[in-house]
UniProtKB/Swiss-Prot annotation:
Belongs to the universal ribosomal protein uS17 family. Keywords: Ribonucleoprotein, Ribosomal protein, RNA-binding, rRNA-binding. InterPro entries: NA-bd_OB-fold (IPR012340), Ribosomal_uS17 (IPR000266), Ribosomal_uS17_arc/euk (IPR028333), Ribosomal_uS17_archaeal (IPR019978). Disulfide bonds: none annotated. The lineage of its organism: Archaea, Methanobacteriati, Methanobacteriota, Methanomada group, Methanobacteria. GO terms for cellular component: cytosolic small ribosomal subunit. One of the primary rRNA binding proteins, it binds specifically to the 5'-end of 16S ribosomal RNA. NCBIfam families: PRK08572.1 (NF006345), uS17_arch (TIGR03630). The gene is rps17. This is Small ribosomal subunit protein uS17. One of its GO terms (molecular function) is structural constituent of ribosome. One of its GO terms (biological process) is translation.
């Protein structure tokens, strides 16, 4: 994939919304997170944690955000896996990201 250092999956798929075997182009943010749900069809929920600075208290607070992402057929993922998702065009009302890599050994 151009611009993102991820390896090509071994499995082949015929999903038109696959960034590897379909016609979906990725651009914008690349986010790492943990899969919290994979119950929906071809959709995963990824949770990421980040720190937000609070001026009044001069300290950081920990925040979480949940992002829905498209899961192509060529990538296998389960709850608890560490993944990398990339921004793409809007695929549904809530999906703007697509799964591009499953981290090994985590």
């Amino acid at each position: 994939m151009v611009g993102i250092n991820v390896k090509q999956p071994e499995k082949e798929c015929h999903d038109p919304n696959c960034p590897f075997h379909g016609e979906l182009s990725v651009r914008g943010q690349v986010i790492e997170g943990t899969v919290t749900s994979d119950k929906a069809d071809r959709t995963i929920t990824v949770e990421r944690s980040f720190y937000k600075y609070i001026n009044k208290f001069e300290r950081y607070e920990k925040r979480n955000s949940k992002i829905k992402a498209h899961k192509p057929d060529c990538l296998d993922v389960k709850v608890g896996d560490s993944v990398k998702i990339a921004e793409c065009r809007q695929l549904s009302k809530t999906k703007h990201f697509v799964l591009v890599e499953v981290k090994e050994g985590e």
